[in-house]
Amino acid sequence: INGFALGGGLELAMSCHIRVASLNAKMGLPEVSLGVIPGYGGTQRLSNLVGKGKAMEMVFTAGMITAEEAFQCGLVNSICEQEDLILTCEKIASKICRNSKTSISSAIKAINAGFIDGVDGFEVEKKEFGKCFGTEDFIEGTTAFLEKRKANFN
């Protein structure tokens, strides 16, 4: 997130798994000042990320918060200088890419399940955990661990 992420821009950012903001970023959901409410999951994602009280404050005041405030309340995962934004994102992506794509996919399903009404996140986790066994990634990961080397997931 670089610069302003207001309304739909913040709603789009909140739909991402991980958010990184430059220190010049300003974020907010000003829709109530226009006579509507945040849409596209904005109210739901915001409250899941920052908690009910902070979400209500942000929506009701239609104000903006700084990158530092967004980091403190959990709206963004990390902050950095504007000139370091791309490099910071690339470093995070590189760390993710070193891991098992199959396991990451299963982890996303399990984590997201905990936020869906009527879905038992623990059951989804148990199912996804079980699916990981016997995969090529599991074999590579455990073999690499036993051989004291880094796994090579391709």
Residue positions per predicted region:
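CoA-thioester-processing core
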Residues: 6-59, 73, 88-92
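Terminal low-complexity tails and localization/encapsulation signals of metabolic enzymes
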Residues: 143-154
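Acidic, divalent-metal-coordinating active-site segment for phosphoryl/phosphodiester hydrolysis
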Residues: 62-69
